[in-house]
Amino acid sequence: MEESSGRREELTSAEMQRKDDQAEAWGDRQLKKKKHTFRLLLQNTQRLPLSARDPKHEAILNWMFTDEANAVILTEINTYWPNVRPHQQWTERTRGKIPQGEKHRFVHNRHGSPTGTLQYGGVGTFALGPTRHRLCSTGEDLTGLGRWVWMRYKGKGEHHLRVVGAYRPNPQGTGEHTVHAQHQKYFLQKANNRDPQLAFTQYLSKQIKKWALLGDQIVIALDANDNLRDGSVQRMMARQ
């Protein structure tokens, strides 16, 4: 929670430097981070570039650094990692470019087999700076669909913080490679005819309850593709 003081507020790059619509900011104004603040950032990338020379790649790194992130969630990575060349893997193309240090984890649909590097969906999570040393474990959606990924931090005593990054598919479209179509294919192969959006909400709800029973404090960074004022995701969260 960051509160404004009476003095002139110092804005970060979230408001001052973003000019392209790929990094358009929504919500409250983001201020200079105060001491003892844990800052979590979320962005829908609409595909993470594979080239370290891509301006979008540089913009994402700059955003992480200048906006003083402790944790970052990227959704719609749109990358099939098994087909990405070694020199284009995240670790290789960011070597020496994140001075504060980082740990990361990407998830994608493991049941697909694209011929190239494009696969719609997927999520990435990053722990940055000194707080990354508090990271005790990471994990992902156990179905292998790449719907969410989490990082678990150890605090004082037995306190734990679980940061979850998730991407809920759009409603059914026309293509066979959309995230909705990928998930629907998986469920039908399991003789499960649930709508992928409904399945997402139900599965995540169960996971949240399990994590809560462990005593974790939980933060969900969600690209919901839904009305968060009165949609199904809002109702699911209200029941937790």
Residue ranges: model-predicted function:
Residues 58-138, 236-240:
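Active-site surface patch of divalent metal-dependent phosphodiester/phosphate bond hydrolases
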Residues 1-61, 129-240:
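Active-site regions of metal-assisted phosphoester/phosphodiester hydrolases
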